[in-house]
């Protein structure tokens, strides 16, 4: 599920959670994605507002330079599938927040989507929730054996590192700061695990 919105920046309405007396910078915790730079600033700005209306931020990505696209990936807090209405609510909130703070000086496009089944692993809770499933991981810092691209079974994570069992049987601990990206591999087991259970009669 995805929607797009284009904006030229600036806006008159300050969201209630950014009124005077509310902090405009929030620390990243184990339930929020870890970002740096402009993506980190945007994550700090929008995550509290999303949480206040029942959503969780999964990832912020900025693509392009001339007219950048701000990609927001989110979940519902209750873990039910994200709908088009949800994407629209998220889009309106994010646009209002970014128009107030104006972290991007030029025109930009907003893209809001669900994480999908083969989702990125960006938070400690993602690594723990999907323990037992296969993931592909790209590293900025190689492992002791010199590898920067791994495929293995997720074993879980804490605030410092994620643990993965490789196909060779070796278990490795990967500091979050060394992980460039990590994403679940689409398998039958993952599809079954993420199927929405039938509604009770």
UniProtKB/Swiss-Prot annotation:
Xref: InterPro entries: Ribosome_maturation_RimP (IPR003728), RimP_C (IPR028998), RimP_C_sf (IPR036847), RimP_N (IPR028989), RimP_N_sf (IPR035956)
GO terms for biological process, alphabetical: ribosomal small subunit assembly; translation
Matching SUPFAM superfamilies: YhbC-like, C-terminal domain, YhbC-like, N-terminal domain
The keyword Cytoplasm appears for this protein: yes
Gene3D superfamilies referenced in this protein's UniProt entry, alphabetically: RimP-like superfamily, N-terminal
Keywords: Cytoplasm, Ribosome biogenesis
Predominant location category: cytoplasm
Keyword Cytoplasm: yes
Cellular component, GO, one term: cytosol
Compartments in which it is found: Cytoplasm
Coiled coil: none
Function comment: Required for maturation of 30S ribosomal subunits.
Entries under NCBIfam families matching the protein: PRK00092.2-5
Family: Belongs to the RimP family.
Protein's recorded name: Ribosome maturation factor RimP
Organism: Acidiphilium cryptum (strain JF-5)
Encoding gene per record: rimP
